């Protein structure tokens, strides 16, 4: 009984699907018929226009009686058509048909003829209509080819859905069958067990053997059916997932075709038709206006209708005339099979890894396709604009023919010399057809690419929702630093308005990488709240814990400039600024704009300089935020430079956008600097309420650095004693450069290659060893905690001022990369995680720390002397914060304060010991040693603090469980939000979200007020508790070849280049 009902169920589902596909196929055929009918109507209309002007030219010398007969003839002809009756009933005429009717009405008013007018009709207007008719037919044929291609693609998608649906039905049926067989085997096993419970002393020996063998057979059969059921169940889940993904992609493709592609196809059919018809009729109008001024009233009506020749409105009317053909169909719904209640993509454990891999592949593929599609789209739009320029050329004015009293022959020669010149026509037509061919080729490429993007995006979005990875945005808005206590006082009369400065500062801190900023609108309610707060004299953006939406803050900034009574660019300068477009050389154009803007008031010029410097900085992140100078100009052009009402809004807006784009790109050339114009200047590097200088600022040349710190001691690799380490977890190297080892293996470490890697040896092989997978034997008690606590010891020494370090101290595993490699890393680097920025120093530059060296003394818990070891020198060697890599990457100078190790540790776990750096003290920039008493006092305080923390650690270790690097971090993030005044690490999920799929260059700027990102020893776990491997595997560093005469690479507290680590 189950088999017939199952087949009946399958047939019903398939029949319903085939019926829906059949309706779509019929709809596609009907659409093609409608387009063909539209083209035939246009050709017939153009033929009528040709006949009309030909007849009108023949009887132009007759009296008004003959003209009236002509008008009546064509009016009767149009009234007899079926389409005319429909148009008359609906009162919804297409703009070309409306022009045709008004033209016939105008003919009734004509009462006079002229030879010049007859010549213009025969040799100018009729030829235009012939060309329009040819163009319309050609456009329709090319559009028809694209339509057939789109129809085939759509049917392929529907067939694919049909195949996937049947596959899903088949696997689900097999799963149900396997389940029933498994249940049957279980019942047989239960029966056999029941029999085996009978007393065995009444059973003969032969029967006992038979029962045992039957029990074994039933058990084997049950195991086979259990395996078969599991296999079929997995296949059913995968088939259902594939069905749901294909279903989502199919619905997206169908929706895109009906909403976007159909509109584009109709535009292709209309390409140049209205514009060319506009030109032909304007030629007629020009002749009529010069022939007799008494006919102006009637001709004004026709001119108004010609001006209303609008392809968009005609397209809307045309689609409304045939709603059944152009209405999008209903979305395909998921058809559950045999009581299957799961209607979503399943992310269960057997398929979760596969779905995550597929999601990553889709994301990577989509990123590439979107870039390619955007480039093709720009090319298509530029080509379309070229075609529109060709078909909208204003060559319809024939007023020159009526300026003097001439004979018919002279008029004919004049006309033929202008528009009808054969070489001119041939060249123009050839250019137009060549451009049209290129346009259709690019349009086809764009439509095919966008179709693929639509399908992949639909699958990606569904997988993203299923896997629950859509929360990256909230991590990107975490606090990036604490507010400087010396924030500058701003009164109500400040040069830069408070609302402008606060919005720009907020975007600088939290929104430089925000995709679609200024283009995506924010919440209107939030925008009004922020605006009202500023109007009350408050600053709602001063609180760094505020969770305002970036799009809303950007909307407030645009709303402020839009609401100015006097625009930032005065209306009196609008014409002069627009005229700069004629200058092709961008640098000369910028100089011309500079001359015009220097005439503006000083206050306006300062605000302009501040705003456009910010927009230029924002455009440097166009790879992340998708807002290049052109897109920013589109958003700010209408706001900063509104087009006067007397100007053409459409044509002028493109020129306005080009002017604003030029100012954004060449703002440094256009606006005077701080020496020429005193006033606030936009700072790229902002922290809290204060700012520090741009990362481009120079702290001295490399030669100066060498001279100032040339006496820094070095330690070569030969002088280093190997360190012994024990593996905490199993590790398999991902390349020949990485070492593989088992848990508990002994390794020898030579020196630290980066924050995540060691150079070491295992089983006679040299290579890289990941720091998180090992326990360093003699480093846990000396230098690991020393590095992690160096900032605490530096904080007690007073403010840190600018200093220079030797170029020899800039030895980092990634410092000597080639420029081309760094350039590639900068291009594809993702936005770094937010971290604290250093406070501003007295001279206006970001503070720069000198390297720290350890003295050659020993240390124990009872002595204030400091430890000394060659490895200490290697680990304490600094890196110049103002390295060329850092200067080349603006806005990222302070973002490496959060390291991988910090993100994997408990926030509240105290360090084992504090240690201070001896030798060159970080509190001074003149390389002078401290007073011995001061050093002794500082060391004593540090050691007392370390002892107290050791006692506290011992107390906590008896209560708390061993830390789990994943669960503990997640629990802290969930229960205790990160305060704005700390640089505690984010959760591992945050690191995953920030790092994405590409490595990035991470740098930091040392500060006396912030915690250093260094290597802290983890708390030893309790006995019996098994540690887990790190949540994230470090990406191997690409190490350059070291010079034997140079010291080995060492980690630094400066801006370590993390471009090669994960």
UniProtKB/Swiss-Prot annotation:
The record marks 519 as: Arginine finger. The modification Phosphothreonine is found at residue 978. InterPro entries: AH/BAR_dom_sf (IPR027267), F_BAR (IPR031160), FCH_dom (IPR001060), Rho_GTPase_activation_prot (IPR008936), RhoGAP_dom (IPR000198), SH3-like_dom_sf (IPR036028), SH3_domain (IPR001452), SLIT-ROBO_RhoGAP (IPR051627). Residues 785-799, 914-923, 974-988, 1053-1062 have a biased composition (Polar residues). It comes from the Eukaryota. Residues 720-779 form the SH3 domain. Residues 481-671 form the Rho-GAP domain. Residues 1004-1013 have a biased composition (Low complexity). GTPase-activating protein for RhoA and Cdc42 small GTPases. Together with CDC42 seems to be involved in the pathway mediating the repulsive signaling of Robo and Slit proteins in neuronal migration. SLIT2, probably through interaction with ROBO1, increases the interaction of SRGAP1 with ROBO1 and inactivates CDC42. This is SLIT-ROBO Rho GTPase-activating protein 1. It comes from Mus musculus. The gene is Srgap1.
């Amino acid at each position: 009984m189950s088999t017939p009902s199952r087949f009946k169920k399958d047939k019903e589902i398939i029949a319903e699907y085939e019926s829906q596909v059949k309706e779509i196929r019929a709809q596609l055929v009907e659409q093609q018929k409608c387009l063909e009918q539209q083209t035939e109507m246009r050709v017939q209309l153009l033929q009528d226009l040709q006949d009309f002007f030909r007849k009108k030219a023949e009887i132009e010398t007759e009296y008004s009686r003959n003209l009236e007969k002509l008008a009546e003839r064509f009016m009767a002809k149009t009234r007899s058509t079926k389409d005319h009756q429909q148009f008359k009933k609906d009162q919804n005429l297409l703009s070309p048909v409306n022009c045709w009717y008004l033209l016939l009405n105008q003919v009734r008013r004509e009462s006079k003829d002229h030879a010049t007018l007859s010549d213009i009709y025969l040799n100018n207007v009729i030829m235009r209509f012939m060309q329009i008719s040819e163009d319309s037919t050609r456009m329709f044929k090319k559009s028809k080819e694209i339509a057939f291609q789109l129809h085939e693609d759509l049917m392929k998608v529907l067939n694919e859905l049909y195949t996937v649906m049947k596959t899903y039905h088949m696997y689900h049926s097999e799963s149900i069958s396997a389940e029933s067989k498994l249940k049957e085997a279980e019942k047989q096993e239960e029966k056999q067990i029941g029999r085996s419970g009978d007393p065995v002393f009444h059973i003969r020996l032969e029967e006992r053997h038979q029962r045992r063998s039957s029990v074994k057979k039933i058990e084997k059969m049950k195991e086979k059916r259990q395996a078969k059921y599991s296999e079929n169940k997995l296949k059913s889940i995968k088939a259902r997932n594939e069905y749901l993904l294909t279903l989502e992609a199919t619905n997206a493709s169908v929706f895109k075709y009906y909403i976007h592609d159909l509109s584009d196809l109709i535009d292709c059919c209309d390409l140049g038709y209205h514009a060319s018809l506009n030109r032909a009729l304007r030629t007629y109008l020009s002749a009529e206006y010069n022939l007799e001024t008494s006919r102006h009233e009637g001709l004004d009506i026709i001119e108004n209708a010609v001006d209303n020749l609008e392809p968009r409105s005609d397209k809307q009317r045309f689609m409304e005339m045939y709603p059944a053909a152009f209405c999008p169909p209903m979305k395909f719904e998921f058809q559950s099979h045999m009581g299957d209640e799961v209607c979503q993509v399943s992310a269960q454990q057997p398929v979760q890894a596969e779905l995550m891999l597929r999601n990553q592949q889709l994301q990577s593929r989509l990123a590439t396709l979107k870039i390619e599609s955007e480039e093709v789209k720009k090319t298509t739009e530029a080509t379309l604009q070229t075609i529109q320029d060709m078909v909208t050329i204003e060559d319809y004015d024939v007023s020159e023919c009526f300026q003097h009293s001439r004979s018919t022959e002279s008029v004919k020669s004049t006309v033929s010399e202008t528009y009808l010149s054969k070489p001119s026509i041939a060249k123009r037509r050839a250019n137009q057809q060549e451009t049209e061919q290129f346009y259709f080729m690019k349009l086809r490429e764009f439509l095919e690419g966008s179709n693929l993007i639509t399908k992949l995006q639909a699958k990606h979005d569904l997988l993203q929702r299923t896997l629950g990875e859509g929360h990256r945005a909230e991590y990107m808005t975490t606090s990036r630093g604490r507010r400087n206590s010396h924030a500058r006082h701003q009164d109500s009369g400040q040069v830069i308005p408070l609302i402008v400065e606060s919005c720009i500062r907020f975007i600088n801190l939290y929104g430089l990488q925000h995709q679609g900023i200024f283009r995506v609108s924010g919440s209107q309610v939030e925008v009004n709240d922020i605006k009202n707060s500023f109007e009350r004299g408050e600053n709602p953006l001063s609180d760094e814990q505020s969770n305002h939406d970036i799009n809303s803050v950007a909307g407030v900034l645009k709303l402020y400039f839009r609401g100015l009574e006097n625009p930032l660019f005065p209306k009196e300068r609008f014409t002069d600024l627009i005229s700069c477009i004629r200058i092709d050389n961008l640098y000369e154009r910028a100089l011309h704009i500079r001359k015009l803007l220097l005439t503006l008031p000083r206050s306006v010029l300062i605000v302009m300089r501040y705003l456009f410097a910010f927009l230029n900085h924002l455009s440097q992140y166009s790879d992340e935020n998708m807002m290049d100078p052109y897109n920013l100009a589109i958003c700010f052009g209408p706001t900063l430079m509104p087009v006067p009402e007397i100007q053409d809004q459409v044509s002028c807006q493109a020129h306005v956008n080009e002017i604003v784009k030029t100012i954004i790109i060449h703002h440094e050339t256009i606006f005077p600097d701080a020496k020429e114009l005193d006033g606030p200047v936009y700072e790229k590097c902002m922290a809290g309420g204060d700012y520090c200088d741009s990362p481009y600022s120079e702290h001295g040349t490399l030669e100066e650095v060498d001279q100032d710190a040339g006496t820094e001691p070095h330690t070569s690799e030969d002088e280093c004693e190997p360190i012994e380490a024990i593996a905490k977890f199993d590790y398999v190297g991902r390349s020949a450069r990485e070492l593989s080892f088992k848990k508990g293996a002994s390794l020898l470490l030579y020196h630290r290659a980066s924050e995540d890697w060691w150079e070491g040896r295992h089983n006679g092989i040299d290579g890289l060893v990941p720091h998180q997978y090992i326990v360093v034997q003699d480093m846990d008690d000396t230098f690991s905690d020393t590095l992690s606590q160096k900032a605490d010891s530096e904080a007690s020494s007073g403010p840190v001022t600018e200093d220079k370090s030797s170029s020899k101290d800039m030895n980092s595993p990634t410092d000597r990369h080639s420029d081309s490699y760094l350039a590639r890393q900068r291009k594809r680097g993702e936005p770094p995680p937010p971290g604290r920025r250093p406070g501003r120093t007295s001279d206006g530059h970001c503070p720069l720390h000198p390297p720290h060296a350890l003295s050659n003394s020993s240390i124990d818990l009872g002595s204030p002397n400091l430890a000394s070891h060659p490895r200490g020198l290697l680990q304490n060697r600094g890196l110049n914060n103002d390295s060329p890599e850092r200067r080349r990457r603006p806005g990222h100078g302070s973002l490496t304060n959060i390291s991988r190790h910090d993100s994997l540790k408990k926030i509240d776990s105290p360090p084992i010991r504090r240690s201070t750096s001896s030798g060159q003290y970080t509190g001074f920039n003149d390389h002078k040693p401290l007073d011995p008493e001061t050093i002794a006092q500082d060391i004593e305080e540090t050691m007392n603090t370390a002892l107290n923390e050791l006692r506290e650690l011992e107390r906590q270790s008896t209560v708390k469980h061993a830390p789990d690097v994943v669960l503990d971090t997640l629990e802290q993030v969930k229960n205790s939000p990160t305060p704005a005044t700390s640089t505690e690490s984010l959760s591992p999920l945050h690191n995953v979200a920030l790092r994405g799929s590409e490595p990035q260059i991470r740098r930091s700027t040392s500060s006396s007020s912030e915690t250093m990102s260094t290597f802290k020893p983890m708390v030893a776990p309790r006995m019996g508790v098994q540690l887990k491997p790190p949540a994230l595997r470090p990406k191997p560093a690409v190490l350059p070849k070291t010079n034997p005469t140079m010291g080995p690479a060492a980690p630094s507290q400066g801006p370590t280049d993390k471009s090669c680590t994960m």
